[in-house]
Design a protein with these regions (language model features):
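Short hydrophobic/aromatic helix or loop-helix immediately within or flanking a transmembrane segment
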Residues: 42-46, 57-82, 177, 491
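Short periplasmic/luminal acceptor-recognition loop of GT-C membrane glycosyltransferases, typified by
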Residues: 60, 184, 188, 427-508, ...
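Transmembrane-helix signature of polytopic, membrane-embedded enzymes
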Residues: 100-127
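Membrane-interface transmembrane helices that cradle and orient dolichyl/undecaprenyl
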Residues: 111-115, 147-167, 340-351
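Membrane-interface alpha helices of multi-pass inner-membrane proteins
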Residues: 130, 165-182, 188-193, 223, ...
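Short acidic/glycine- and proline-prone juxtamembrane loop motifs at membrane-interface regions
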Residues: 134-143
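Short hydrophobic alpha-helices at membrane interfaces in multi-pass membrane enzymes
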Residues: 152-176, 207-219, 304-307, 354-360
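Perimembrane helix-loop-helix junctions
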Residues: 158, 187-225, 258-259, 289-296, ...
Length: 574
């Protein structure tokens, strides 16, 4: 009892401190930093707002993630009548949604994993975003809709199969997750199997002898698929739709075989293994010394894995400070292995729905994402965050099941180490274009005062480019714009108060010299641009596409626009 009272007193102090740190960290993220992937997410949604159609006029590889961003942008433009300041608004909406999700998590899990563990977990969920920014890009959507779906399913299966409408709502959230990253749809099969098993073991009501939740999940997904096709197909037809899908799937950036991808991953895995070997060795040595001193009978394997994850996370936090890089996630495989161990002997416990509805679907999704993404091996670890967190929740649940298993709250310690890493990166690192290392001490931050990013602060290069785009495009309200630039500036399409339309096949960086862009104008001549932008500091080989532009478009005027470090060339098309 005295120990419990001491813990309660400690948490009375820690709770406001943790909440304050989380709020301050996310406030910094709300106002500081701008990365090209966040701009890309905004431009995808903006295309739908301006009347572009999925697959027909949008040839984007990630266009299925455009719907949520489009809804929020449409709301903002309807209220404000402009896109000025839209970046802050969308970030704020995402932040409010994250806070609500964390609150729901705390409410549903405080009995299962304890009030203190639920609070710590909720703070981690609030602070974490896959790519650090708040913009609703496809990776962020995949994570957050996955969590939202899980919360719906988990409540249904742990509260006596009441409120079946939660399964339907969860299916809708899951479908948004699958749309954001279609390769993750394999998780649906695992979720279905888990629902069948959980339903039968819990004697859930059935529909046609199949547990009701599993049936509702399938029907919900089918309804979403039907609604999506009803939205996409009118005016295009199935034949054109399938042609567009084939065209987009053949994006040259993703032209690699499974064997080529595996060979690349294997070549990169050695560096990760070298990094993880050090904290693993330290963990084993510490556990051996502990065992030699106490000779206790306990789960030494689980302790070693948890200690490994803790040491690796703290080492990554140190590296993040030293390198000014927020991409130090080498600890995640250790955390996943520790998570997997936490699920042993979990049948019939609170850990079982965590395993079938969270951990295993997350691992299945990661396996297919790993095959299809362009990211390097260590960068893919962001997709392991959700199954790793489910393992942490399982550790906390296990301790609730066996309160006498030891004085050391291992699950809380693992989550605390993860939170330290997240807060260090949030406070110290600054997002800049190209994911280059930058921190609050060295980044030359400037305020953006015009355009959709107005009111935010970014590194000098990014801020100057936003102002240059504003100055270059302000005279062309209502016109159609093409950025013939390798590194696309997605917010540039939203200049001139949101009156511009987009006159190019894709707004993703790196595809502008793709020969499909020529095909785009042949099939959709109405998308030919009125104004074209070149970047004088072009970092990609755009010579072929620029030559085609000069030959096929009648350029009536061209002039430079310079703002600080940004240098653009504006071409006016007849």
């Amino acid at each position: 009892m005295p120990q419990k009272n001491a813990q309660d007193r400690l948490w009375k102090i820690l709770t406001p401190v943790l909440l304050l740190l989380a709020v301050l960290a996310m406030a910094k993220t709300l106002f500081v930093g701008l990365e090209i992937d966040e701009e890309y997410a905004f431009s995808l949604g903006f295309r739908l707002v301006k009347g572009d159609r999925l697959f027909y006029t949008m040839w984007e590889p990630h266009q299925l993630s455009a719907l949520p961003a489009a809804l929020v942008l449409a709301l903002y433009t309807a209220i404000a009548g402009t896109t000025t300041g839209a970046l802050l608004f969308v970030r704020a909406v995402v932040l409010v949604c994250k806070a609500a999700m964390s609150a729901v998590f705390y409410r549903d899990f405080k009995q299962t994993i304890g009030r203190h563990g639920a609070l710590l977990s909720a703070v981690v969920l609030f602070v974490y975003t896959p790519k650090w920014f708040l913009g609703p890009d496809y990776i962020s959507q995949q994570f957050h809709f996955t969590v939202a779906a899980f919360l719906c399913f988990y409540h249904y299966y742990t509260h006596g199969f009441r409120r079946p409408w939660l399964v339907v709502l969860g299916a809708v959230c899951a479908c948004f997750s699958f749309l954001a990253f279609p390769q993750s749809a394999l998780a649906a099969a695992v979720i279905f199997i888990g629902m069948v098993l959980l339903g039968r073991r819990g004697k859930e009501p059935t529909i046609c002898k199949i547990p009701r939740g599993a049936v509702l999940f399938v029907l919900g997904c089918m309804a979403c698929a039907a609604a999506f096709l009803a939205y996409v197909l009118p005016g295009m037809g199935l034949t054109v739709f399938l042609q567009r899908v084939s065209l987009i799937l053949n994006d040259p950036q993703y032209d690699f075989t499974t064997s080529q991808r595996l060979a690349l991953l294997a070549s990169q895995a050695l560096n990760t293994a070298k990094f993880l070997a050090k904290p693993l060795a330290a963990s084993v040595v510490l556990c051996l010394l502990w065992w030699a001193k106490t000779r206790q009978k306990r789960d030494w394997t689980g302790l070693a894995l948890n200690l490994w994850a803790i040491l690796a996370a703290l080492l990554c936090a140190v590296r993040a400070v030293a390198d000014s890089s927020s991409d130090e996630r080498y600890f995640m495989p250790a955390l996943v292995l520790a998570a997997a161990w936490a699920f042993r002997k979990g049948r019939g416990t609170a850990r079982e729905p965590l395993f079938w509805l969270g951990f295993l679907p997350g691992i299945a999704a990661y396996a297919f994402i790993l095959r299809s993404t362009l990211l390097g091996f260590s960068a893919t670890f962001m997709y392991l965050t959700w199954p790793a967190l489910c393992g942490c929740f399982a550790m906390l649940a296990c301790r609730q099941e066996n309160p006498e298993q030891g004085k050391l709250p291992q699950g809380q310690c693992v989550l605390a180490a993860l939170l330290v890493f997240l807060l260090v990166c949030r406070f110290w690192c600054v997002l800049v274009t190209g994911w280059k290392p930058a921190n609050v001490a060295t980044a030359n931050l400037k305020q953006i005062t015009a355009g959709p990013a107005a009111g935010t602060w970014a590194d000098e290069k990014a801020a100057d480019m936003q102002m240059a785009l504003y100055e270059a495009l302000e005279p062309f309200a209502g016109k159609q714009v093409l950025q013939a630039i390798g590194e696309q500036y997605g917010l540039g399409f939203m200049m001139a108060g949101g009156t511009l339309t987009i006159g190019q096949a894709s707004v993703i960086s790196g595809t502008d010299s793709d020969p499909r862009f020529i095909q785009y104008y042949e099939e959709l001549p109405e998308k030919r641009p009125d104004v074209i932008l070149y970047d004088e500091a072009e970092v990609r080989d755009m010579a072929a596409f620029h030559a085609w532009i000069e030959e096929n478009f009648t350029i009536t005027a061209r002039y430079p626009v310079t703002h600080g470090t940004a240098h653009l060339q504006v071409l006016v098309v007849d």
